Amino acid sequence: MRILNYTIINLVMSKHLLLNINKTQKGIIHIIGIGGIGMSAIAEILHNSNCKVQGSDAQSNDNINKLQKLGIEVFIGHNANNISQAQIVVHSSAIEFDNVELIAAKNNNKTVLHRSDILAEIMKGKYVIAVSGSSGKTTTTAMIASIFDHSGIDATVTVGGILNSYKSNFKLGGSDTFLIEADESDGTMLKIPAKIAVITSINNDHIDYYGTFDNIKNAFSQFVNNAGSAVLPDSVDIDYDAGNSITFGFENGSIRASNIKQHANSIEFDVLNNWIPALRAGMTKGKCTEMSSQCVTLGSSPLKNIVLSNAIGIHKVSNALAAISVAIKLGISDADIKKGLLEFQGVARRFSLIADIKGVKLIEDYAHHPNEIYATLTAARSITKGKVIGIIEPLRFARIRNFFDEFIRIFMMFDYVILTPVHPPEDKPIPGCGIDDIQKALISNGFNNTKIMNDALLISHFISDSTSPSNIVLFIGAGSNIAKLAKETAALIAEVKV
């Protein structure tokens, strides 16, 4: 991968700073929020590129522990002094404008880069497959990675979750192929120089950034048209170059799933392929090559008896169709596609089984948008006729405000709902959008099976007293608190039920 030979001068914007770093070769890159799932991957990439990297975060976590083991210095807590030796300061949209390090960087004329800018620089000259969408990005990227791993493509992979096969959110590859999960929440995907742009789904999330749903659709349209080669659901309503794209779905897509069978921890299905290129792309010594823009539609070429391991729910089939579409575009063989999906090990916190205690399954899922929570609930219903209890950590007051009625409607589909505090804890409350407001709305609509809890011991007692074999308890949310509650609760229940 050529980035290994890059110097730090390739990763900055300022010409003045370029000269300074070129002379010293000792420029330090400071990453604010380095423990985040995306920022920690950037830190690893830069570290493996022989750049001197450091960073800071409000608290330690597993990502930070891993970075520290690599020799990367991490400051716990934000302080202006943390960036005193840095020449470049990198931040994401999650960092508030009043962050003391960000302010200090600007006041001291440091080069300040957004995450998207440094990613764009890192990927220049690479063969980039970028996966974006309102939901399903992480799982789809992980499935593509698994197919690559079983087809000779040694790609660098960065993803917004911990892949069970890598035990990491990052894998350094040995080729120029770069597979990345591209964040749509702040328009980052528009700066990624993708050869193939993948859209998993589009919904009206992140309205606070985009303003309108039309703006969201226009951004995704720009994303795929920038790439010139696209993979997208057959249901999306955006403008794109249809001549150089593959659509996937269950009814009208060029790549369609049929004969879907849900098993205990896998899904079996067939795929009809109506997209056959005039010139199949191929791999030359493990390197991706560009697909011809010309394609013809011939008779369906079925791919039979695909087994997707570690997957529950129809939405996982949709993710797999996107991954299969990318593989078909690259000319990967049917056998390698099937092998990659059969060996798929899943992603942490994506319908992940934490414990099965005397027939009661405790499952963790990252869902935080109403559509995602509904998909998670539907997946649970597909494997049990018993009760499904949701322990739910809402993500941000603004999202509660934007989707309040949708949350109420979907929460009422559970047998019981326990609400935990809104994540992140520093999020500014919005009147009428707290968990107590959600509970009141549920009760006023006739749904009385709801509590507010934030203590693993209390939750464990409730689950022990209220569940029986074949019941499922879903820990739902994107924050760190719900993940901690899930692990602690599982341990406590195991002690009680032994």
Curated annotation (Swiss-Prot):
Keyword field contains Lyase: no
Catalytic activity as recorded in UniProt: UDP-N-acetyl-alpha-D-muramate + L-alanine + ATP = UDP-N-acetyl-alpha-D-muramoyl-L-alanine + ADP + phosphate + H(+)
Record's keyword terms, sorted: ATP-binding, Cell cycle, Cell division, Cell shape, Cell wall biogenesis/degradation, Cytoplasm, Ligase, Nucleotide-binding, Peptidoglycan synthesis
Residues binding ATP, per UniProt: 133-139
Protein localization: Cytoplasm
Domain of life: Bacteria
GO CC annotation terms, alphabetical: cytoplasm
Main location: cytoplasm
A single GO BP: cell division
Functional pathway: Cell wall biogenesis; peptidoglycan biosynthesis
The protein's Enzyme Commission number: 6.3.2.8
S-S bonds: none
MF term (GO), any: UDP-N-acetylmuramate-L-alanine ligase activity
Protein's job: Cell wall formation.
Similarity remark: Belongs to the MurCDEF family.
HAMAP family: MurC (MF_00046)
Name this protein carries in UniProt: UDP-N-acetylmuramate--L-alanine ligase
Biological source species: Wolbachia pipientis wMel
Gene encoding the protein: murC
